[in-house]
A protein has these predicted regions:
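N-terminal Sec-pathway targeting helices
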Residues: 1-13
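Solvent-exposed, non-transmembrane regions of membrane-associated and secreted proteins
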Residues: 17-262
């Protein structure tokens, strides 16, 4: 009897053990959900690429290159300080230094541009009437009418040709600090009056009176370029030499400044 009761007790305990084990196993097998880490759910945002900052514009103005004359005035003036400019007429043989002797305006009638005695003289302006800056209303450059063709010897021959005022219309004067470009507007026979003595061209009325005296010339050989206008305030260059066949009169070529390059 005792043995039978013990067996039942063992059987009951066994069943309890099985039931408890099953319950324990079921509780331990429930899935565990891990919480996501913040880094695994946030999409990575690319860092913005900084835009290139443009270079600030320079506030410094561009400096212009200083004018450099094609004429070597340093060498010329070392040889003769009276040389202040250079006269050139493209397409012709006129290519001479310009000289001026302070206090002796007749000097270059009998001396060349080196200052040596010469019957051909030089191309010169007068210090009593003109500066060496070419800023006067009218500048007169003189040169002999040499039979050999030197100096202004071919001036009348050149500008008496048909279309000469167009073909040889440009006259250039070079100075150490700038160059001036002139356009020929007249070439005329003229009387022997001293232009700058008789016409004070700093006075606009006298300036216009001088121009009128040019346009009134009606002689054979007078030529005019009607396409070139000359007005008060303009700068006029006159090339003056003896008239061929009449040394008591003058032959003039007149040009007006249209551009300065500095």
């Amino acid at each position: 009897m005792k043995k039978r009761g013990l067996a039942i007790l063992i059987a009951v305990l066994g069943v309890l053990c099985v039931v408890c084990g099953a319950l324990l196993l079921q509780g331990n097998s429930a899935p565990v959900t891990a919480e996501p880490s913040p880094s695994s759910t946030v999409e990575a945002t690319p860092s913005p690429i900084p835009a290139e900052t443009p270079e600030p514009a320079s506030s410094q103005p561009e400096t212009e290159e200083p004018y450099v004359s094609p004429i070597d005035f340093a060498s010329l003036q070392a040889q003769n300080p009276d040389i202040y400019g250079w006269l050139r007429i493209p397409g012709t043989e006129f290519d001479f230094p310009l000289v001026q002797r302070q206090g002796d305006d007749s000097f270059y009638l009998t001396h060349d541009s080196d200052g040596n005695e010469s019957s051909a003289g030089a191309i010169f302006t007068e210090s009593a009437y003109n500066s060496t800056t070419m800023e006067d209303p009218v500048t007169v450059a003189y040169g002999h009418q040499m039979h050999a063709g030197t100096m202004f010897g071919k001036l009348q021959e050149t500008y008496s040709q048909e279309n000469a005022l167009e073909d040889y219309g440009e006259v250039i004067v070079y100075l150490p600090e700038k160059e001036l470009h002139y356009q020929v507007f007249a070439a005329v026979p003229y009387d022997n009056r001293h232009i700058l003595y008789n016409y004070d061209c700093t006075d606009s009325r006298r300036f216009n009176a001088f121009l009128n005296s040019i346009y009134e010339v009606r002689e054979i050989g007078a030529q005019f370029n009607s396409g070139v206008t000359v007005s008060t305030g303009d700068k006029v260059l006159v090339l003056s030499t003896c008239l061929a066949g009449d040394s008591q009169r003058r032959y003039l070529v007149l040009a007006v400044c249209q551009a300065e390059i500095e």
